[in-house]
Amino acid sequence: MKHVLLYCRSGFEKECAGEIQDKATQLEVFGFPRLKNNTGFVLFECYQAGEADKLIKEIDFQSLIFARQMLAVAVEIKDLPTDDRISPILEALSEKEGFPRCGDIRIETPDTNEAKELLKFCRKFTVPMRQAMRGKGLMTAKDNAKKPVLHLCFIAPGHCFVGYSYPTNNSQFFMGIPRLKFPSDAPSRSTLKLEEAFHVFIPRDEWDERLAPGMWGVDLGACPGGWTYQLVKRSMFVHCVDNGMMADSLMETGQIKHHMVDGFKFEPDRKNVTWIICDMVEKPARVAHLMGEWIIKGWAKEALFNLKLPMKGRYDEVLQDIENLKQFLIDNKVKFKMQAKHLYHDREEITVHIQSLSNISPY
């Protein structure tokens, strides 16, 4: 197997391709990406057989910004007959040496309007395909979360990639997309960005500790309160910094303080802030530096923020801003964890998370 399939947002294939090319080169795996604009996926072809498995094992999936899912492709099948789609897939896999026995199956499509028309078929096809795979010993008799995940990705009727991912190094979500419901009482749809970020960046078993009731947060560029809403509903208190008006529903909770000042000049009176969150429409380098300052001063322990992307050179801008921010923290002797992701609810932006591991006094 020498192909790696990556899902991404439609229109960001170039950025996803540049990223997998860089990661593969760092591991001394050489190849090239195949892509078409607005298809929602990238296929990376390694020059050497067997190196696809190496990539999906050794590239830390959490380090990928633009990829929603990463899997090794065993076979690409075209022109599946409508009267029997299962047999050609079973036959193709039975001829593939080294294909692992899987514990789960996901029959998916790329995230495009055209491909998503196949989702109804994918849902209906999952049960018979799973039964057939188990019958041939290609899957465990019962779901096993410790075994690889079998993926069938249909990019057109009768045309699919068949491959696998490792559960310790993939997206846990179907199609790589968390399924979140918009809360009817939220002030704006931007609230889903922050909720998704919590799902992606914060392990669920750490939510009670790191997103605890009674914590204080600061929301820069808060108006009308989509991001603030996520903190308030977790019983946190929030300094909302924006010259615009906040939603009345949030003001009435008694959990927020509204500061009508410039987000770049705001400093909390009491240095008891755990979270700094920021969704300001500003140059990404400026926002990244500001978030770094909050962390190195000890004003916040964790930061979640968006970096707005330029029309051109998006991947280069992201690399530069992330690298500069990391170096800024290192130069100030801060120990930290950092992740960045182009989330499903992001558009022309990425979301970055920093967790400070240093005990920095804010005084």
From Swiss-Prot:
GO terms for cellular component: cytoplasm. It catalyses: cytidine(2498) in 23S rRNA + S-adenosyl-L-methionine = 2'-O-methylcytidine(2498) in 23S rRNA + S-adenosyl-L-homocysteine + H(+). Keywords: Cytoplasm, Methyltransferase, rRNA processing, S-adenosyl-L-methionine, Transferase. GO terms for molecular function: S-adenosylmethionine-dependent methyltransferase activity. Its EC number is 2.1.1.186. GO terms for biological process: methylation; rRNA processing. The active site is at 308 (proton acceptor). The keyword Transferase applies. Pfam families: FtsJ, RlmM_FDX, RLMM_N. Monomer. PANTHER family: RIBOSOMAL RNA LARGE SUBUNIT METHYLTRANSFERASE M, RIBOSOMAL RNA METHYLTRANSFERASE FTSJ DOMAIN-CONTAINING PROTEIN. This is Ribosomal RNA large subunit methyltransferase M. It comes from Vibrio atlanticus (strain LGP32). The gene is rlmM.
